[in-house]
């Protein structure tokens, strides 16, 4: 009888250890497979799944999924590195509550398809409308403005940015002032007057999952704040 009881205790302890320690590892492997099935590709990808208590994972609920990877591509988003945490996840319905983290070396597409470099993107908020704070160099945006002006209008110009959102466009030695503005998720160069047309620098849609809502020009960096639907991106 005593031997039987000891065996039951040992069996219970084994099951407990499997549920408490091994279950998150197993679910992590399944989550990695689901991530890859969604179109995610990356190098050295690590997915850590946790729930409190761990047996809650058997119901399909995870408190947190932490994803790190490099050389990432997923749908229209490309990044040199990703460090993102998903919270309050229903793995059965693939619904995500909130998102937080950082993307570095991000590339999106300009309206003409050319790549646009974003140094860093910080994510925070609801998975369906995550606030994305993007940091770009002023030099990158000036080059982007010049290339899009040339592509969209045929006008060769020099573009200089100045805080908080001012622009000077010089064509054949003549300068025209303007502003960087946002409208319907796009970043626009809007010249004052009617001499030059409005030029779209970044627009949501093919090649760009971000919707821009505000822009601020600093001394060396430009900050874009907008939203991204991480839920759609990962499912």
Question: For each of these PLM feature ranges, what is it?
Answer:
Residues 45-48, 154-165:
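Short glycine-rich, low-complexity/disordered patches
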Residues 95-150, 163-165, 170-205:
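Small-residue helix/turn framework positions
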């Amino acid at each position: 009888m005593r031997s039987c009881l000891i065996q039951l205790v040992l069996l219970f302890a084994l099951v407990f250890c499997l549920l408490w320690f091994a279950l998150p590892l197993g679910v992590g492997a399944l989550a990695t497979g689901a991530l890859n099935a969604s179109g995610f590709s990356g190098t050295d990808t690590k997915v850590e799944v946790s729930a409190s208590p761990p047996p809650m994972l058997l119901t399909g609920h995870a408190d947190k999924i932490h994803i790190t990877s490099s050389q990432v591509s997923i749908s229209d988003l490309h990044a040199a590195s990703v460090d993102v945490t998903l919270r309050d996840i229903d793995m059965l319905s693939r619904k995500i509550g909130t998102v937080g983290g950082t993307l570095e070396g991000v590339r999106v597409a300009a309206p003409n398809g050319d790549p646009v470099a974003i140094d860093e993107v910080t994510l925070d908020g609801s998975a369906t409308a995550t606030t994305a704070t993007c940091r770009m160099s002023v030099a990158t945006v000036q080059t982007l403005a010049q290339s899009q002006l040339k592509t969209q209008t045929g006008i060769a110009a020099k573009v200089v940015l100045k805080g908080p959102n001012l622009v000077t466009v010089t064509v054949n030695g003549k300068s025209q002032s303007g502003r960087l503005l946002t409208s319907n998720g796009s970043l626009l160069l809007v010249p004052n007057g009617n001499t030059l047309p409005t030029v779209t620098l970044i627009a949501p849609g093919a090649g760009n999952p971000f919707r821009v809502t505000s822009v601020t020009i600093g001394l060396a960096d430009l900050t874009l704040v907008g939203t991204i639907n991480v839920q759609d991106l990962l499912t």
